[in-house]
Amino acid sequence: MVFMAFNGEEKGMLGSSAISTDKNLNKIYSNMTALFNFEMVATESAFGKNALFMTGDEFSDLDELFNKNAANGLKINPDPYAAQQLFYRSDNVSFVKKKIIAHSFSTVDMTKATHYHNESDDIHIVDFDNLTQIINNFGKTLEKLSPSNFNPKYNDTVKF
């Protein structure tokens, strides 16, 4: 398991582009099964608590494989904002270009998110109980995954 942090998304994926093209990390990338990019997971989703949506769900089977093994009712839902092409507009795309299964996971309800890209984005909007539940259940789900039950693939509709 690899944890990465990068910045500069709003300036053109600067951080994720830099780390995804770092040749010193190629051995890690060649052994990577999937990349989970968490983005705006501090609020309750339109699907309720303990639920996220995955961008680009139509491009791979990652969500189906994950949901088959999900712990404690955690649910990955299809992207309700697919028309906005968030899959190609977030840091995961730097890894998609390397043909690594990479999707963003979010809880943001764009119909209610008045703080999105605004100064009003503040700690008071965070639903800590829901965030903790999602993190804990995501971790418990990852513990259940192995090469025998988790080998996600892109389909032929994704644009590398």
Feature-to-residue mapping (PLM):
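Metal-dependent peptidase/peptidase-like ectodomains
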Residues: 7-109
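His/Asp/Glu-rich mid-to-C-terminal helical/loop segments that flank catalytic regions of hydrolases
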Residues: 1, 107, 112-160
